[in-house]
């Protein structure tokens, strides 16, 4: 069992989705004995401009514009983090070179946002737990 560590959890499920997820459950279990930051996926440009209005998307937009804090304490040892960054969409790109470049670009932006949150929480020696974020998670360097 892991105890007294700082853990970063990234995955494809957002904390604020209405249905449960294994990733959220794992983060909650980690938080029983460790400090955990759960990182939600940033909005993509397509989400930002084309998604129907919902409170979840509107909240993320307020965070992007600096009108709301992206770091929220969920419980004693667990924080939800919504990055301010907006991603360039990559899911429909067929050229490997361009896909790789944009994925690295998105990962760099996300890494910088995560590091900002880690500094605020004073996380030092941390473990990165990647749950199903295959492309982006592979590129994350914190």
Region spans (language model):
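Flexible, charged surface loops at secondary-structure boundaries
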Residues: 1-4, 31-32, 72-75, 119-124
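N-terminal subdomain of nucleotide-sugar transferases
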Residues: 1-64
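Active-site proximal beta-strand in glycosyltransferases
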Residues: 7, 35, 127-130, 141-142
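Short, acidic/polar
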Residues: 20-25, 131-139
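Short amphipathic alpha-helical segments and helix-helix/interface helices
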Residues: 24-28, 115-118, 140-141
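N-terminal strand-loop element at the rim of the active site
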Residues: 41-95
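Short loop/helix-cap segments at secondary-structure boundaries that form the rim of catalytic
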Residues: 73-74, 137-142
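Conserved nucleotide-sugar donor-binding subdomain of glycosyltransferases
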Residues: 82-136
């Amino acid at each position: 069992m892991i105890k007294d560590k700082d853990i970063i959890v990234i995955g494809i499920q957002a904390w604020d989705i209405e249905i449960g997820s294994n990733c959220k459950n794992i983060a909650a279990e980690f938080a029983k004995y460790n400090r955990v930051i759960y990182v939600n996926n940033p909005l993509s440009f397509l989400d930002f401009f084309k998604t129907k209005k919902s409170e979840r998307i509107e909240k993320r937009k307020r965070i992007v514009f600096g009108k709301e804090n992206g770091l929220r304490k969920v419980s004693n040892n667990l924080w939800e983090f919504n990055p301010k960054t907006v991603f360039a969409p990559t899911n429909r790109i067929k050229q490997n070179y361009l896909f790789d470049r944009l994925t690295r670009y998105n990962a760099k932006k996300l890494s910088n946002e995560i590091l900002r949150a880690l500094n605020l929480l004073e996380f030092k020696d941390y473990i990165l737990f990647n749950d199903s974020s295959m492309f982006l998670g592979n590129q994350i360097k914190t």
